[in-house]
């Protein structure tokens, strides 16, 4: 992502920049795959009986699907912007579920969204106190998207309160000044 760049400043300074959407997608897929294998080995998870919810199914989300499908996990998908685009195009979109369904059914919820602060589908602090309090199971939360998609203060409290089983954090809110307690 490039949410940390001051695009207007770069334009004024005549500095050219580019981004490469999806360039690390396969690496993230491999990372999630290895996390699931580690959960199986060290925590005794039976992956064939594990439901994984993916929030965000763009370049990275698709790579994660391809990487974890062979493990036998059930995969549930949530991506409101893609669902809306498919619906408007008259294409099948029913496989995208509401967040509430992931909160109810998933043993693991993994975030793969850009950081969006405005508009119809904001992702800033998408996983916050309200999100955690609505969980029906005690899932593991994985964040490999942008740090501020998961409110780090709230995920820490959810861990302390036993609302979530564990958290796998690959990207932190306020990097490099991360929450050391988390």
Tell me what each language-model feature is.
Residues 1-45:
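Phosphate/diphosphate ligand-binding glycine-rich loop within oxidoreductases
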Residues 5, 27, 63, 150, ...:
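Residues that form or flank phosphate/diphosphate-binding pockets in enzymes
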Residues 9, 67, 131:
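Hydrophobic/aromatic ligand-binding patch that stacks against planar heteroaromatic rings
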Residues 35-72, 90:
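Glycine-rich NAD(P)-binding loop of Rossmann-like domains
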Residues 75-77:
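Short beta-strand "acidic-cap" motif of Rossmann-like dinucleotide-binding folds
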Residues 79-81:
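N-terminal Rossmann-fold cofactor-binding loop
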Residues 84-181:
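Rossmann-like adenosine-cofactor binding region
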């Amino acid at each position: 992502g490039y949410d940390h760049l001051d695009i207007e400043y770069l334009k004024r300074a005549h500095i050219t920049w580019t981004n490469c959407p999806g360039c690390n997608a396969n690496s993230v897929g491999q990372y999630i795959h290895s996390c699931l294998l580690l959960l199986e080995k060290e925590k005794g998870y039976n992956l064939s009986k594990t439901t994984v919810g993916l929030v965000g199914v763009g370049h990275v989300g698709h790579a994660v699907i391809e990487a974890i499908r062979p493990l036998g996990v059930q995969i549930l998908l949530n991506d409101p912007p893609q669902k809306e685009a498919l619906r408007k195009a008259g294409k099948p979109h029913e496989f995208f579920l509401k967040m509430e369904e992931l909160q109810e059914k998933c043993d693991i919820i993994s975030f793969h969204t850009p950081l969006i602060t405005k508009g119809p589908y904001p992702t800033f602090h998408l996983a916050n106190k309200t999100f955690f309090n609505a969980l029906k199971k005690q899932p593991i939360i994985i964040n490999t998207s942008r740090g501020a998609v998961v409110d780090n203060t709230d995920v820490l409290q959810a861990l302390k309160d036993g609302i979530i089983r564990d958290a796998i954090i690959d990207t932190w809110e306020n990097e490099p000044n991360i929450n050391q307690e988390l």
